[in-house]
Amino acid sequence: LDAMLVKVTGKTINQLFAEEGEATFRDRESAQLARLEGSRKTVLSTGGGVVLREQNRSLLHALGYVVNLTATVDELTRRLACAKDRPLLSGETALDERIRQLLVERDPFYADADIRIDTTAKTLEDVVAEILDFYDGKRAGVL
């Protein structure tokens, strides 16, 4: 979803946050997500803040299964230590503390996912296999 916003606006996520603020970014994010309504057979990767709005959570569920990929704070800190495109992770607060704060704030919304997968110490193949097992179980009516 972020990549779609960058393409549509011609600006990076950092530029959008700096020039317009988080509220306007979230408005743009919601509008872009709404454009996908009715889409089928689509895999959509969103930023972690998309779930902050009820309308977005509802639309995500209408589009299909919602998969929440998570990891421990230590693992997320390691993965994001060099990230330059995460405006909410920059600033004075230590990265691990900021990640912890965001997870606490957002966890109730992440819990709304159809499946949550802890990706800590898992390979990409392991995670994909878990998602496919979930999907196959849903299609077979097992889950």
Task: Outline where the language-model segments fall.
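Short amphipathic alpha-helical segments
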Residues: Q55-S58, R78-A81, A129-E130
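NTP-dependent small-molecule kinase module
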Residues: S39, V104-L143
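Short acidic active-site motifs
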Residues: A31-Q32, Q55-N56, R98, E105, ...
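Short glycine-rich anion-binding loops that position phosphate/pyrophosphate groups of nucleotides
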Residues: G48-V50, T72-D74, K122
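ATP-dependent small-molecule kinase phosphotransfer cores
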Residues: D2-H61, D85-P87, F109
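A glycine- and Lys/Arg-enriched "phosphate-lid" helix/loop adjacent to the NTP-binding pocket
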Residues: Q15, A62-P108
